[in-house]
């Protein structure tokens, strides 16, 4: 029969690309799990009282090309002016070799956080490069693998300063009055919950206050003046006050390292090393401290260890500081970093090398000197006599100057009294400087770049002598080897080949939702209309961004059942913090500041108690019953006991145990009965979208992991986005911003991140996903995630017991496999199974969370039956291998599991094992073979012999 045009115009094509199993595969999988249809399966699993009566109003699906065209038109409403606003954001020139081989390479952007180091050596090496850059430029002993942004890093520096301070009674933190305003904003917010008093003043005034435990200084002040704080920091040290210094990464190429001048903590944004402004992010922050304070440091740290063969290998070091282990006692609640952006920044340093960076920084500074000379010659007054790249110029009529600049397509800094600010960057040209002369001096300025360059006296130093760097930087061979594009391309390829990402295999990590990051979703993030905007540009230049964000927020309101969405949080953990802050502020507005107790089920993710502690709350643990559900009797008792001190409950749904708890609405009602609020963690939203909503269930606030449910890639450990949805009564208490007004959100609250819309440039990814899926496609995605998980549970339950199930023996979108009985009977652990999966070509599931001795598997909707069967077959084959150990065929200390993973080097070495080489490295054939570059890591050695810098080239695997 001939098809009509309407039938041939298939708008749902992307849905079929995104969802892995075909219709026929779905039917087969349904028959295996014993369900007649997807809808019937959902009715068996999801409590009837929380299922939505009608679909969310997010529209129908459109094709990839239609969505791209629609978004391109929206992006076209953004105006690409030359922005010299500065304030921590600058235009960059990302090397195309990095753009193509890192940012646009799924081998880099689809990987997960490197908890499994054997399949992560490439990006771990890249992060070690980033740490080495940080150490060299800051002059400190230890660097982290990045934080979320500069302002967040400042807040973390304050918290760390308090942890390491010997002045235990001091509760004041001093902030110099020339730090960036957005930094001060975020620091104030963090201090609010810690009970610290923020004192702002001239830097030298810090010595007048005996109750100060730490001081925040900025080496290159927000208006451009350079500061030599050596004497001040020496005086502070004598008084046991901790010195924290914010620094510009490009300026540090020419300026003295703050660590050499006495700073205890140094941080800043690495954005200038090749990462576009992107209307605020994502960007990596660098963070460094002295070795003696290493255990108080926030964020991830990459360290050098060795593998089972004694070879050098890399891993995440000192994880016992982090929230997934220490919970409310963790140094920070942040469980992500900005790995993809840190790797771009690190590779920028590798590609340019020390001489290239000096040339770039020197050119920026020289152009600034030329600009200053011309403006002075033209009769204008500069507020400072020292600078790296930023000038503050006194003007008679600021509004006239700003208006004239706009007519030239130029943005100047506009928030200074009787002055404008100009920050130059690596993209600035001679022609740009001439345009600035025309703006400030008139078209007939008569200035010549060459003449000004020649006229600048060598003895007139705009960088004070005491601030000039004299030591070598980036002397390690990795920064002096890959300067041709051929060598750089091959280096990046070698690193990517060491890692296991979604471009090679399914990553079945429970609680992580490693779904497809479609090419059509990724394309817009490199469009200059999105990439080049300054976050503090005039709002009329960002109409496209505002429209896109407004549409996305509206869709998320529909998909969550809330009344408003705040896009500011840069990660899920930051979203938790922001949501809990909203609850805290709501109680305070009702004169109920005594509500400080946060109920958290024992099954919760470690981020929950860490976030509660950061929000100034005290954690009370609620028990779970033998089925893994919240114990309602215990909940009632603890809610009643808390009484007027009850702030909220933090609950995940479906639960962290992988089931839909039947009593979730009753949980909400109990907490509300005693005056508390319900924080529903959005980690498992991939099993809710289109089926139910947190708002419909009865929650008051949630964060959404856009890097899980809504397709932003994990980037190897960041970026992420954690916007929060709130009911109307909490909307006035979500984060605001002191630099940029956030339209549509009625709040005067402090910020939690540096930019008003967080990592705005990756929001188009989620916009594209929702637009191409539509309401029906989004529901199908949730249904298929649930089917895939139940298919795995059904096929594996005889070999590996499923620890928790809900009604009718079903699971939600993930399942927990109990390895404890196997370990007791055979000695083979969940670690052994995880490492053996590498030989089969798979990333391990989540180990020992939320229950020790288990593996949690989440397949997502994007994996086909073929790939899922391959995983199941691997798990069943491993079960057979365990049987052979149990039967004595292989000794417990020498078998394919305890020796896993196996490397190519082993294959060609002497072989004395009781199993064959072929079984070791090709247990499932060679088609999907992944070769790990190292054997199992020695974690104990790595932490006992902490080394977090680049190793000699001869040590690289």
Curated annotation (Swiss-Prot):
Organism: Pectobacterium atrosepticum (strain SCRI 1043 / ATCC BAA-672) (Erwinia carotovora subsp. atroseptica)
Protein name, entry field: Glycine dehydrogenase (decarboxylating)
UniProt superkingdom: Bacteria
EC number: 1.4.4.2
Positions of modified residues (N6-(pyridoxal phosphate)lysine): 708
Molecular function as annotated in GO: glycine binding; glycine dehydrogenase (decarboxylating) activity; pyridoxal phosphate binding
Disulphide bond pairs: none
Alphabetical GO biological process terms: glycine decarboxylation via glycine cleavage system
């Amino acid at each position: 029969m001939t098809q009509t045009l309407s039938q041939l115009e298939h708008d749902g094509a992307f849905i079929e690309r995104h969802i892995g199993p075909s219709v026929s595969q779905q039917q087969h999988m349904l028959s295996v799990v014993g369900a007649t249809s997807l809808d019937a399966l959902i009715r068996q699993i999801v409590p009837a009282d929380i299922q939505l009566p009608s679909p969310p109003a997010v529209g129908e699906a459109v094709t990839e090309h239609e969505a791209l065209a629609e978004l391109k038109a929206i992006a076209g409403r953004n105006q690409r002016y030359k922005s010299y606003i500065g304030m921590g954001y600058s235009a960059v020139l990302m090397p195309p070799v990095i753009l193509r081989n890192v940012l646009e390479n799924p081998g880099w952007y689809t990987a997960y956080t490197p908890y499994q180091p054997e399949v992560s050596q490439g990006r771990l090496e890249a992060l070690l490069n980033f740490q080495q850059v940080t150490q060299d430029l800051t002059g400190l002993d230890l660097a982290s693998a990045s934080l979320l942004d500069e302002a967040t890093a400042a807040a973390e520096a304050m918290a760390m300063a308090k942890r390491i301070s010997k002045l235990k009674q001091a509760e004041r933190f001093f902030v110099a009055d020339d730090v960036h305003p957005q930094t001060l904003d975020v620091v104030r917010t963090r201090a609010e919950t810690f009970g610290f008093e923020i004192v702002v003043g001239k830097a030298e005034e810090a010595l007048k206050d005996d109750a100060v435990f730490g001081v925040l200084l900025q080496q290159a002040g927000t208006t451009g003046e350079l500061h030599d704080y050596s004497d001040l920091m020496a005086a502070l040290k004598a008084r046991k006050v901790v010195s924290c210094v914010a620094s510009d990464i490009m300026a540090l190429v020419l300026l003295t390292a703050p660590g050499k001048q006495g700073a205890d903590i140094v941080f800043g944004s690495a954005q200038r090393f090749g990462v576009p402004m992107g209307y605020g992010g994502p960007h990596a922050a660098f963070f460094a401290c002295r070795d003696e304070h290493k255990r108080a440091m926030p964020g991830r740290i990459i360290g050098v260890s060795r593998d089972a063969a004694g070879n050098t290998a890399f891993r995440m070091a000192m994880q016992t500081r982090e929230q997934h282990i220490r919970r409310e006692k963790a140094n920070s609640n942040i469980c992500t970093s900005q790995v993809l952006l840190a790797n771009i920044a690190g590779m920028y340093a590798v590609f340019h090398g020390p001489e290239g960076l000096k040339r770039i920084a020197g050119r920026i500074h020289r152009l600034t000197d030329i600009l200053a000379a011309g403006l002075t010659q033209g009769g204008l007054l500069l507020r400072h006599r020292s600078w790296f790249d930023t000038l503050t110029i006194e003007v008679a009529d600021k509004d006239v100057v700003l208006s004239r600049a706009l007519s030239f397509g130029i943005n100047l800094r506009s928030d200074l009294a009787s002055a404008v600010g100009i920050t130059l960057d690596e993209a600035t040209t001679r022609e740009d400087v001439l345009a600035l002369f025309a703006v400030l001096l008139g078209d007939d300025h008569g200035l010549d770049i060459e003449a000004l360059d020649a006229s600048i006296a060598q003895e007139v130093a705009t960088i004070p002598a005491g601030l000039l760097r004299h030591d070598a930087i980036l002397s390690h061979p990795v920064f002096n080897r890959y300067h041709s594009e051929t060598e750089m391309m091959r280096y990046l390829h070698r690193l990517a080949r060491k890692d296991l990402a979604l471009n090679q295999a399914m990553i079945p990590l429970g609680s992580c939702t490693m779904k497809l990051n479609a090419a059509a979703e990724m394309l817009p993030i490199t469009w200059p209309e999105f990439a080049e905007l300054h976050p503090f540009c005039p709002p009329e230049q960002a109409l496209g961004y505002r429209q896109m964000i407004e549409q996305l927020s509206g869709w998320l309101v529909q998909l969550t059942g809330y009344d408003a969405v705040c896009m500011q949080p840069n990660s899920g953990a930051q979203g938790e913090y922001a949501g809990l802050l909203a609850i805290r502020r709501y109680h305070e507005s009702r004169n109920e500041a005594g509500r400080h107790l946060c109920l958290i089920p024992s099954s919760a993710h470690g981020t929950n108690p860490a976030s509660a502690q950061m929000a100034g709350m005290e954690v009370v643990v609620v028990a779970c019953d033998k089925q893994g559900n919240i114990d309602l009797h215990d909940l009632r008792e603890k809610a009643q006991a808390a009484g007027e001190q009850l702030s909220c409950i933090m609950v995940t749904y479906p639960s962290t145990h992988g089931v839909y708890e039947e009593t979730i609405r009753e949980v909400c009602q109990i907490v509300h009965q005693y005056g508390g609020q319900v924080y529903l963690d959005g980690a498992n939203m991939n099993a809710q979208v289109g089926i139910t909503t947190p708002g419909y269930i009865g929650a008051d606030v949630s964060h959404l992991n856009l890097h899980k449910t809504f397709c932003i890639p994990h980037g190897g450990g960041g970026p992420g986005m954690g916007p929060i949805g709130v009911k109307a009564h909490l909307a006035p208490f979500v984060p605001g911003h002191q630099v940029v007004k956030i339209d549509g959100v009625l709040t005067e609250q402090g910020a939690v991140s540096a930019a008003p819309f967080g990592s705005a440039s990756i929001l188009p990814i989620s916009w594209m996903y929702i637009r191409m899926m539509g309401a029906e496609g989004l529901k199908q995605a949730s249904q298929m995630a649930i089917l895939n998980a139940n298919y795995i549970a059904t096929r594996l339950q005889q070999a590996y017991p499923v620890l928790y199930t809900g009604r009718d023996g079903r699971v939600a979108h993930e399942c927990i496999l109990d390895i404890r009985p196997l370990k007791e009977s055979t000695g083979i652990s969940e670690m052994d199974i995880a490492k053996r999966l590498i030989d089969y070509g798979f990333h391990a599931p989540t180990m020992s969370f939320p229950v020790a001795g288990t593996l949690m598997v989440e397949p997502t909707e994007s994996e086909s039956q073929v790939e899922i069967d391959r995983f199941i077959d691997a798990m069943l084959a491993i079960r057979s291998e365990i049987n052979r150990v149990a039967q004595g065929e292989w000794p417990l200390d020498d078998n394919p599991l305890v020796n896993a993973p196996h490397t190519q080097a082993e294959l060609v070495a002497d072989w004395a094992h009781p199993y064959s080489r072929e079984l070791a490295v090709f247990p499932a054939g060679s088609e999907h073979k992944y070769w790990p570059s190292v054997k199992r890591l020695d974690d104990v050695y790595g932490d006992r012999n902490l080394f977090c810098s680049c190793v000699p080239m001869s040590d690289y695997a």
